[in-house]
Amino acid sequence: MYHLISHSVYNDMTPFGGNPWSTMTDIGCDGIEMLTSFDSPPESHMPYTQSVHLPYATDWLAAWEERPYEMDDVRARYYMFGRTPEDVVCNITTAMDHAAAFSPAYGVMHLGNVDLHELRCRRYSLDDAKVVRTFCEIMNRVVADMPGGEPPFKVMFENLWWPGLRLVDESDFRILDRHIEFENWGICMDTGHLTVCLPRIYTQQDAIEALLDTCCGYSRDLIDRIGTVHFHYSASAAYRESFEDTPMGDMDMTDYIVSAYPHISGMDQHLPFTDAACAEILDVLRPTYVTHEMMGDDFIEKFMLQRSLLS
């Protein structure tokens, strides 16, 4: 099992000191899962990158269904993968082409979508099955034009709490398995995102128990598809039960999106495990890679805290 730390092409390598490999070796880290962009990757990051996390567009369905929001080109790319179906295919292809320069073991793609008008809502107008089927259609089209009809690296589809692949059970996975037409794919299980989907997660112990209960219910073929785990948790049930349901309404779209950032952080907390019982989750899932997806300036300290619990 390889232990990776999350980092981004938008940040330099300063947190890892003058000799990043020495720092990583000292903390028990085998390399970086690098968040990439739509541009060529920086040379400074390439030696330390073992896997990549491709850029995510929050509401790509708006562009795919040709009902784009009014926003500038840069925001359209990051929030919708562009404005048209052709843009969506082109921008995902571009992101994958640039990420391939890292020669990664795999590349993570979020499989979820939320209407931008509903970012601060409890209920969403989309259903999971439609989102999964549609994203399969998009990815099939993207990959069909690649050499041999396969992606340049294994695509790992990641679960979210927004409509799409949630993995609270196997239903969304079954749709994905039926509709993806290429072979080189797998699942990135994000334990933190799953805890946002599950009820009554008030404490770390609640999270561990609920994750074990859910994951122990997975079939062998689903577990065999889980090649990597984003390892962290959220204990945000109290917040999820109490926040004010706020659709965009007449609010300016940019203001609404900005106002949603603290809401999203309140849901998806990216907390490091501190209880050694968390290792039982990885014993069930048996991934090849574990990415300790920590947030904040102290992300290395959080990595060390969680890594110390695992053999």
Residue ranges and their predicted role:
Residues M1-T94:
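N-terminal pre-domain/capping segments
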Residues Y2, V89-A95, A100-A105, F182-M189, ...:
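Histidine-acidic metal/acid-base catalytic patches
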Residues Y2-V9, D30-M34, P47-L54, G107-M109, ...:
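Hydrophobic faces of well-ordered beta-strands that scaffold small-molecule active sites
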Residues T23-D26, P42-Q50, S171-E181, R307-S311:
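Short, surface-exposed basic-aromatic patches at helix termini and helix-loop junctions that form
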Residues D26, S44-P47, G148-E150, I180-E183, ...:
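Short, well-ordered coil/turn elements that cap or connect secondary structure elements
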Residues T36-F38, Y56-T58, L111-D115, N159-P163, ...:
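Active-site-proximal loop/turn and secondary-structure-junction residues that shape catalytic pockets
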Residues W60-E86, N113-D128, E244-M248, L305:
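Surface-exposed, active-site-proximal loop segments in enzymatic domains
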Residues F81-G186:
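Active-site acidic/histidine proton-transfer and metal-coordination neighborhood
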